[in-house]
Amino acid sequence: MGGKEMRNCKELKHEKNGNVTEKVGKNKGKSKKVSKDESLLSFDLFLEGKEHSAYKFMGAHFITENRKRGVRFTTWAPRASKIYVIGDFNNWELKEEYSMKKINERGIWSLFLPKLEEGIKYKFAVVNECGNNTVYKADPYAFKSELRPNTASVLTKIKSFRWGDKRWLNKREKEGLDNKPMNIYELHLGSWKRKDGEFMTYEEISEVLVEYIKEMGYTHVEFMPINEHPLDASWGYQGVGYYSVTSRYGDLNGLKTLINKLHKNNIGVLLDWVPSHFCKDEHGLFMFDGSPTYEYEAWWKANNEGWGTCNFDLGRPEVKSFLFSNAMYWINEFHVDGLRVDAVSNMLYLDYGREYGEWEPNIYGGNGNLEAIAFLKELNTIIKKEGKGAITVAEESTSWEGITKPVEEDGLGFDYKWNMGWMNDTLSYIELDPIYRKYHHNKMNFSMMYNYSEKFILPISHDEVVHGKKSLINKMWGDDWKKYAGLRVYASFMMGHPGKKLMFMGCEFGQFVEWREWEELQWNVIEEFDIHRKTKEYFKALNKFYLENSSLWSLDYEEEGFKWIDADNSEESVLSFIRIGKNKKEKLIFICNFTPEVYYDFKVGVPELGEYVEAFNSDALEFGGAGNIVGDSILKATEESFKDFDYSISVKVPPLGTLVLKVK
């Protein structure tokens, strides 16, 4: 099952059966004599797995050496016997004068070439340890790559950029988000909007996205991966160029323009990031030097059969330096405010996606990947120390303990974790006919049993509206009116539930078709159909309501910020609860009715004697509802007790609707 160690000169090649085959050949990997300039470079931290800015010296950099302007190429390929730099400048031929020098025994190769200009395409021709096979690889540290289907790296400088977001960054560093509003709009840049059916540039996107986010009232955007990737249908999650801003939408400064404009308009930017696995395309990281390099040496551990990818070797120092540096690259160079770390479960578990007999336990006999655990702890420690307020979010789908617990307390150290349990439970509930919902009431209240075990974000992400899962609006039960009413009550229940929020693009105006990465959202329906326009207005109003009421976010992760009124009314499929703000006077009462019945004189407990008024109602006519609203009426609490409350009121509750009340 496991791979064998490499000794002397052996070509290591993965086989489908999980073993490793060896072919002994002549060792051609001896170090050459290096110049004084080369010897001045220190790779100690990189080789120890402690380098956080490897992109500043690995890859291709325009420099002056011995009074000559040119490019220094540097790469890591420990088992290569020879490496050539090939490209436009030498007709892609393997010539000795373009042969890189091995400058240490750990596999650092380097070469200075004069008179090269920006825009030149290049690759590394890597000869394996035996000298009998050559692979043509893109530069793992390249800042730019060709647009697919072409695969070469492109010589690019990190040009100066005039940032205007200092005020935003200072605020980010000083203030955390736990007690602040966080309402995230997740989007895929290639399909949010298009121009004449083609990709828009980062600059063009900035002209429309910023105004839309401001109009709708979201606090953050989350971009699906924007590093270079060969396959559009992978959405960026199967990457090759970890340091290359995808050429689909432009260049590095184009992306900086987009982020800068978002920040100047007080909109945060999160980025999906994938340190778990990478694609197996021939020009990429896979078998980089003809043998396992960035991936695990043991094939069972390296091969991710479910996704057709390879898992990073998270225990290898040079791979750790590659990934730590990449995380800081996005934070330092592009000012992103946080990384949403993809597929954390795949990293944590040795048996993730594997059957019995397909994996080996760790040294303690368990299924935890000890190297990945250590990697994630170190990653989060680095970002906390050097990221100046940048956050990390874990996409983790199991009950692994301590995801958001501090590293000092033996947690993994993430700031937030997606609440996949809440998402799965509630989405399965809303698809049910209301007749049967009372038998599944626990799907809507169970999340509060573990809500304070982690710092959760409630996600309705891209994964839930593709591959036959149906769009969010189409998951709802009933005819069109009931579907839109169901969407409104569900969204307002989500907004009232403790935890930060995330909603995928298109859900906010009720797009019926599933998300398609090859075309833009169906924006035309907003103009053509009144219900889509009203649904958009509903989400706009709901987002504004969220922002304006600190009780909905100031105590998300404190138990005193939430109190059930009635968690167990399964017979009527109603959930009622109170959200409480920091000063304890800020209180909102939520009554969420998941049936199509109007409940007249519905009794609900209230925290104090006094007068109550309507703060929000999902059934308002302007949102496409039936108009079952309290309006300007005043509801007077009585001393009639209800559940754990000494006082109560009676009110009309709208069908498939949420009524929110507050003290006058």
Curated annotation (Swiss-Prot):
CDD domains hit by this protein: AmyAc_Glg_BE (cd11322), E_set_GBE_prok_N (cd02855)
Record keywords, A-Z: Carbohydrate metabolism, Glycogen biosynthesis, Glycogen metabolism, Glycosyltransferase, Transferase
Annotated Gene Ontology cellular component terms: cytosol
UniProt feature, compositional bias: Basic and acidic residues: 1-17
Keyword Transport: no
Claim: DNA repair is one of the keywords in the record: no
Domain of life: Bacteria
Example GO BP: glycogen biosynthetic process
Residue ranges of the region described as Disordered: 1-31
GO molecular function: 1,4-alpha-glucan branching enzyme activity; cation binding; hydrolase activity, hydrolyzing O-glycosyl compounds
Catalyzed reactions: Transfers a segment of a (1->4)-alpha-D-glucan chain to a primary hydroxy group in a similar glucan chain
UniProt pathway annotation: Glycan biosynthesis; glycogen biosynthesis
Free-text function comment from the UniProt entry: Catalyzes the formation of the alpha-1,6-glucosidic linkages in glycogen by scission of a 1,4-alpha-linked oligosaccharide from growing alpha-1,4-glucan chains and the subsequent attachment of the oligosaccharide to the alpha-1,6 position.
Protein name, UniProt field: 1,4-alpha-glucan branching enzyme GlgB 2
Lineage: Bacteria, Bacillati, Bacillota, Clostridia, Eubacteriales
